[in-house]
Amino acid sequence: MTRILAIARNTFRENIRDKVLYNLILFALIMILSSLALGQLTLGNEQKVLLDLGLFSISVIGMLISIFIGIGLVYKELEKRTVYALIAKPVHRHELILGKYLGLLFTLLVNLAIMTVGLEIAILYAGRIGFGGHLRLLPAVYLVFLSLALVTALALLFSTFSTPALSALFSFFLWIAGHFGKDLQSFGEITKSAAAKWICNILYYVIPNFANFSVDSRAVIQDTAYFQPMTPFAIAGATLYCVLYCAAIISISVLIFMRRDFK
C-alpha cells in the first residue's frame, strides 16, 4: 500500500505540472463567469441558468482532464522507458496501475474543488440562493466526481494497450454512448428482431451508464436549483455502481498490463 501511495503522489505532482490542466481549469472558470452573465439576461431564470451551465462546465472540463491526462498515464512511462526502471524495482505492476489511477483521482478532486469554489463565488455574487442551496450543490458535484472516476478508469484501460489518440477516441465514444443507455434499452424493447434485442440488452449492461451521474438531468438540477434534496439511497446507488464498475475496469487494466512483455 505504501508503494501505491508513493506512485499516486508522484503522479499527482506530474499532473499539476501539466500546462493543459491549467488551461482547462481557466476555461472552466471563464465558462462559469459566462453563465453568470447569461443568467442575468434571462429574467426569472437566472438561478437555473447559472447552476445548469456551471455544473455542465465542471462536468465537461473534468471529462477532458480525465481523458487527456488519463490516456498518458501508462503511455508516457512506456515512451520515456521509465516503466523498465519501475518494474526493476520492488514494484508490482498492479501497484503501478493502482497508483497512477489514485494519483489522477486526487488531481481531479483538487480541480473539482477549484471549479466548485468558482461556481460558489458566482452564486454568491448573484445572491439568488441561500446557505442550504450551497450545501445542496455538493451532491451534484459529487456525482460529477463519480462520473470522472469512471472516465478515468476507461482512459487508463485503453492506455494499457493502445495509442493516446485511439485511447482518447475510445474513451470519448464510451462517454457519449454511456449517456444514451436508456435509449438503447428502449430500442431493444420495441425492436422485433431477437438478435437486435439481445445485442441492445448486452450493450446496455456492458457500456457504462453515465446517466446515473448526469448533472444535466432534471433530478440533479432540481436538487440544486429548486432545493429538492437528493435521497441518500440515490447517492448510495450511484456510488456503488461507480465503485463496482471502476473495480472491474481497473482489474482488466491490471491483467492486460501484467501480460505485456517489456523486454
What is each PLM-predicted segment?
Residues 1-22:
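Aromatic- and glycine-rich beta-strand/loop motifs that create alpha-glucan
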Residues 14, 75, 86-88, 155, ...:
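Helix-capping/transition residues at the boundaries of transmembrane alpha-helices
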Residues 23-27, 98-99, 170-173:
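Hydrophobic core positions of alpha-helical segments in small-molecule transporters
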Residues 29-73, 97-166, 200-201, 232-235:
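Secretory targeting signals
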Residues 42-44, 166, 170-255:
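Terminal transmembrane helical anchor/hairpin motif
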Residues 73-105, 257:
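Helix-loop-helix units of permease transmembrane domains in multi-pass membrane transporters
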Residues 166, 259-263:
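Short cytosolic juxtamembrane segments of multi-pass membrane proteins
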